Amino acid sequence: MSALQENGKSETMSNEKEFIPVRIAVLTVSDTRKIEDDKSGKTLVDRIEGAGHIVADRKILRDEREQIADQLRAWCADKDVDVVISTGGTGLTGRDVTVEAHRDVYEKEMDAFSTLFTMISFPKVGMSAVQSRACGGVANGTYLFALPGSPGACKDAWDEILSVQLDYRHGPCNFVEIFPRLEEHKRRK
């Protein structure tokens, strides 16, 4: 049980609901990584598949804001992708532009995702957690998350937040059950 679960006692897992696999695209943002040495991307792929979800696509892009935003938009337009998780480019250096690319695409941002990620990171990395700009949001009915480029950060975000919220059986609420409602604003016009 995680530290967050110990403190937030109202979480439940329903045996009455069936597991629903989610289609997830993984994007590694790096000027140097290739698939063969992409440990963070592999960490995510292994955890996604291990949980019973589907890796819909996997790519590596350089730290170029427009390229990242274009790829995010392409996945948001692809009906075979429900969720996008990127790793890398969330720090403070001049080349770290993943967060800006995500925010170029978001229709709504999930502020609590950043907060929860920082809470999870702090006991492990201490004050270094202040340098993370992990974020999450929604665009075109697709969830998007930007994680730091370390395998540990990917593991923590998946194990503590994403695996729980992407499991339809989790209560009192989860991301999967509100998929059909993400684009309600478009139907009202």
Region annotations inferred by a language model:
Residues 1-189:
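Non-catalytic beta/alpha edge segments that cap or flank active sites
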